[in-house]
Amino acid sequence: MPNLIILVFVGGAFGAMCREFIMLSVPRLADGFPMDIFVANIIAAFLLGLTTSFFKKDKINQYVHLMVGTGIMGGLSTFSSFVFGAVEMMKNPTEVLVSICYLVASLIVGFIAVELGLMIGPKEKPKDPQVASE
């Protein structure tokens, strides 16, 4: 059990460093749209879908899934910053519409990113009907 926690911890630290790199590299747009947080969350959503697909098809073991899926993707994505950014934008009456667009776009594009990750990952092999009937 402690080894699993260490894997998540190390993955989370690496994911947080990746998030900080993205936040330093991706500029905020002039209208206040937090593109840096949006990009980090969408990348994490896609990679979590992909990692989960590999895990479900037994292409990676539980240790890799915990370190990458829970640790790295958990450290990379940032729900608290997502919500905080939206709340801060809503304090400015001229940015309310941008804030709503940010929230909706994050959910829709995040959903699509997870689905793409799952679709790109390994596919389940169809079960052999003769094996099932024996």
Swiss-Prot record:
Residue intervals passing through the bilayer: 4-24, 35-55, 67-87, 100-120
GO BP, one annotated term: fluoride transmembrane transport
Record comment: activity regulation: Na(+) is not transported, but it plays an essential structural role and its presence is essential for fluoride channel function.
Binding site for Na(+): 74, 77
Coiled coil regions in record: none
GO MF entry, a single one: fluoride channel activity
Keyword Transcription regulation: no
Keywords, alphabetical: Cell inner membrane, Cell membrane, Ion channel, Ion transport, Membrane, Metal-binding, Sodium, Transmembrane, Transmembrane helix, Transport
Gene Ontology cellular component list: plasma membrane
Chemical reaction(s) catalysed: fluoride(in) = fluoride(out)
Subcellular location: Cell inner membrane
Pfam families per record: CRCB
InterPro entries: FluC
Membrane topology reported for the UniProt record: Multi-pass membrane protein
Function: Fluoride-specific ion channel. Important for reducing fluoride concentration in the cell, thus reducing its toxicity.
Similarity section: Belongs to the fluoride channel Fluc/FEX (TC 1.A.43) family.
NCBIfam families attached to this UniProt entry: PRK01636.1-1, PRK01636.1-4
Protein name, per record: Fluoride-specific ion channel FluC 2
Taxonomic source organism: Yersinia pestis
